[in-house]
Amino acid sequence: MTIRYPNGKRYNQASQPQKTPIKTHTYSNRGMSLEEELNETNQYYLTHNIACVHKKPTPLQIVKVDYPARSAAVVKEAYFKQPSTTDYNGVYKGKYIDFEAKETKNKTSFPLQNFHLHQIEHMKQVVAHNGIAFVIIKFTLFDEFYLLDAKHIIAFWNRQNTGGRKSITKEEIEEHGSLLSCGYHPRIDYIRVLDMVYFS
């Protein structure tokens, strides 16, 4: 039997999109990207009226678009309109917060080449205006997360520029940063550390 849509188009069973399975969450969610984990955490904070933090959109200039079907558009070429600053920003307890999320597979250090000068300058500006700026670093091999204040990132960046190390050792991150606790909800509880570091 042939089934047709109201517009006369033939129904094709194979062309129907497959239902994506519902994600099941384990306690550790190993394999999840840091961005996914933070987005999930921020959604929890927003839903429970704890904080309002969002991922910043990346501004793109679309140059070329193909229309393989009348109702579909495929972007073929796009460029960044401007250099991005940091990944996330928002408000917590009346204070502006702004942070970058980075992950590394290195066991002993975090390479500073993962940062760009405009990101460092942006963090300096946030701090100069009494905002809270920091970086969340994930060591993927250990499934460990650290919150490191912008003043330390800036100091390590300056050290690199004066002939010093081009990375931050894990020991330095452990010394100057705060280990973030992980759980089910919120996944990465960075607000608890903000309370201890900035609001105590």
Curated annotation (Swiss-Prot):
Q: Does the keyword Ribosomal protein apply?
A: no
Ligase listed as a keyword: no
Q: Which GO terms describe its molecular function?
A: endonuclease activity; magnesium ion binding; nucleic acid binding
Q: Where is the composition biased (Polar residues)?
A: 10-25
| An individual GO BP term | DNA repair
According to its UniProt record, which reaction does this protein catalyse?
Endonucleolytic cleavage at a junction such as a reciprocal single-stranded crossover between two homologous DNA duplexes (Holliday junction)
Question: Could you give the cofactor binding note from the entry?
Answer: Binds 1 Mg(2+) ion per subunit.
Which positions bind Mg(2+)? 85, 87, 100, 119
Q: What keywords are assigned to this protein?
A: Cytoplasm, DNA damage, DNA recombination, DNA repair, Endonuclease, Hydrolase, Magnesium, Metal-binding, Nuclease
Give the subcellular location: Cytoplasm
Cofactor or coenzyme needed:
Mg(2+)
CDD domains found in the cross-reference section = RecU-like
The region called Disordered is annotated at: 1-25
- EC id: 3.1.21.10
- Site (Transition state stabilizer): which residue positions? 102
- Give the similarity note: Belongs to the RecU family.
Name of the protein in question: Holliday junction resolvase RecU
Q: What is the lineage of its organism?
A: Bacteria, Bacillati, Bacillota, Bacilli, Bacillales
